[in-house]
């Protein structure tokens, strides 16, 4: 079982607990009484196989959070040469570069938080 696998009853939210967007997603799920668990990259880690699963679902370009502080502080050469072949290694080394939260459940995939998308996915 990879890190992005989601069982039938428990929704796993992948992200970082102090991220405002993750907080919004967690609040929305709690407000709608949807059972969930946070998988915090800082606490629980993140492996390359899991990143590969997310990349297959969303594409590497959609996993990179170019609005993050980590992106702004990333070496310019890494930014310029970032490609499909290098992205997963860069993301594994810098998990705060991953757009969040990520939820995969029974064929549904969500990245980021949009109340409208969550409403459609969970109702």
Model-derived features: positions:
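Short, Lys/Arg-enriched N-terminal segments with co-localized hydrophobic residues
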Residues: 1-9
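A structure-centric signal for secondary-structure junctions around beta-strands
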Residues: 8-10, 98-99
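Thiol/selenol-based redox catalytic cores and closely related redox-interacting motifs
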Residues: 41-123
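Local sequence-structure signature of Cys/Sec-based thiol-disulfide redox active-site neighborhoods
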Residues: 9-32, 36-41
């Amino acid at each position: 079982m990879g890190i992005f696998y989601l069982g039938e009853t428990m929704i796993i939210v992948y992200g970082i607990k102090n991220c405002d967007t993750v907080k919004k997603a967690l609040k929305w799920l709690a407000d709608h009484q949807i059972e969930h668990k946070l998988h915090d990259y800082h606490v629980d880690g993140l492996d390359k196989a899991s990143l590969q699963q997310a990349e297959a679902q969303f594409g590497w370009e959609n996993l990179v959070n170019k609005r993050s502080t980590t992106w702004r502080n990333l070496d310019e050469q890494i930014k310029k040469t970032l490609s499909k072949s290098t992205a997963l290694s860069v993301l594994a080394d810098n998990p705060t570069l991953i757009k969040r939260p990520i939820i995969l459940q029974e064929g549904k995939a969500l990245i980021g938080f949009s109340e409208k998308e969550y409403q459609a996915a969970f109702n």
